[in-house]
């Protein structure tokens, strides 16, 4: 502590760190999930939902509705949906994702090759400048030993049971992305 007449070298740094630490939890709450879905009923490419009431169920396949419900169930701030068009390749879909800001990505209907394409894309995007830049993370059941901070590997195969039905591990990635997006820094997803 500085005495009268002495200069204290870092009083504002301490205050700034305390302020940032105090607000970090508030700033971390409720992220945005982006789902990539193949849907025959949806007519557009992009959709944004803040509550399940925003979703018009008759405009979606029953399977897609289950994935949207899974992503919203644990309290994500917003769910973006990018619908894969009939003749559209993954490169085009991923290029569109570069223009959107979101935190968590899931592709519940992906086959293993599509999943690997998304894993590679996320590794390239993570930490770069741009709309999604450092924040994008991907939940995958196919990724194995990806050894990257932006890839969450759902290692348990089998069937996941939910109030919305039974799901494969890859399908359940929508729920895991929604769960993690709904968690502030002071909560753990493994105790939810």
What are these model-derived regions, one by one?
Residues 1-192:
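Surface-exposed assembly/interface segments
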């Amino acid at each position: 502590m500085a005495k009268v007449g002495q200069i204290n070298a870092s009083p504002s740094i301490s205050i700034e760190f305390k302020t940032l630490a105090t607000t970090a939890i508030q700033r971390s709450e409720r992220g945005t999930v982006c789902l990539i879905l193949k849907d025959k009923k949806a007519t557009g490419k992009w959709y944004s939902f803040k509550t399940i009431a925003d979703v018009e169920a008759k405009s979606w396949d029953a399977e897609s509705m289950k994935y949207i419900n899974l992503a919203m169930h644990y309290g994500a701030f917003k769910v973006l949906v990018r619908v894969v068009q009939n003749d559209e390749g993954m490169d085009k879909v991923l290029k569109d994702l570069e223009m959107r800001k979101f935190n968590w990505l899931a592709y519940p209907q992906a086959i293993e090759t599509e999943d690997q394409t998304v894993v590679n894309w996320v590794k390239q995007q993570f930490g770069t400048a741009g709309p999604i830049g450092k924040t994008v993370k991907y939940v995958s059941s196919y990724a194995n030993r990806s050894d990257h901070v932006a890839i969450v590997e759902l290692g348990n195969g089998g069937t996941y049971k939910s109030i919305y039905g039974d799901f494969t591990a890859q399908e359940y990635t929508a729920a895991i992305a929604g769960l993690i997006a709904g968690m502030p820094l002071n909560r753990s997803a493994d105790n939810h």
